[in-house]
């Protein structure tokens, strides 16, 4: 796995699923392939994206700044600086300075990542802020190691939270989760169907599913009534794809 592939993997792991994630993935691919060289436009685009947390925007902004060549005097962006200030906690800043001193002596990606993993996410964000604000300089590989360590910590906590929700025994939460998943699956079906003539059937199935979810929410239904809803939808989607000559088995 190449260094940039690894960085892309870690960064995308903290971006919520949805159309925006696909857009960000495309931007990262373009940046890493040297196709997108307008840092100013890229940062303006990132700043106005909805849904993303300030920290995720800060990390993405840091990645773009490290990767896209730019004029030396290019202004640093406030939304990135604010996200990478470690919540203004002086303890985070103290730890960030100690971490920076270690990273300054480290030239490899994996070495930097190993060192960074022993620090809290707040200290890691502050350390990124130091480098972003040109208060310190490390090798690009070390900076990428720092980014990936931060993403790993964030992804770990997201995974713990997700696992708690998935394994909850509360039937109301499970019911709502199934309906949300069915609704997002229906939305994905509508987007994938596009405008081809054969798409009408898939669009119809997706539309009916979304109407059903809306009705279930409006009138209130038994928590078990949503069981299997998402899987039914996915089976419909796979049947449609088969007829279109597309084989995608890894949705479930």
UniProtKB/Swiss-Prot annotation:
- Where is the protein localized? Virion membrane; Host nucleus
Cellular component GO terms, alphabetically? host cell nucleus; membrane; virion membrane
Q: What is the role of this chain?
A: Plays critical roles in virus replication, from virus entry and uncoating to assembly and budding of the virus particle. M1 binding to ribonucleocapsids (RNPs) in nucleus seems to inhibit viral transcription. Interaction of viral NEP with M1-RNP is thought to promote nuclear export of the complex, which is targeted to the virion assembly site at the apical plasma membrane in polarized epithelial cells. Interactions with NA and HA may bring M1, a non-raft-associated protein, into lipid rafts. Forms a continuous shell on the inner side of the lipid bilayer in virion, where it binds the RNP. Determines the virion's shape: spherical or filamentous. Clinical isolates of influenza are characterized by the presence of significant proportion of filamentous virions, whereas after multiple passage on eggs or cell culture, virions have only spherical morphology. Filamentous virions are thought to be important to infect neighboring cells, and spherical virions more suited to spread through aerosol between hosts organisms.
Q: What is this protein called?
A: Matrix protein 1
Q: Which GO terms describe its molecular function?
A: RNA binding; structural constituent of virion
- What is the additional note? Most abundant protein in virion. When expressed alone can form virus-like particles in transfected cells.
Q: Which domain of life is it from?
A: Viruses
Q: Looking at the record, which segments are called RNP-binding?
A: 165-252
Q: Which positions does the motif Nuclear localization signal occupy?
A: 101-105
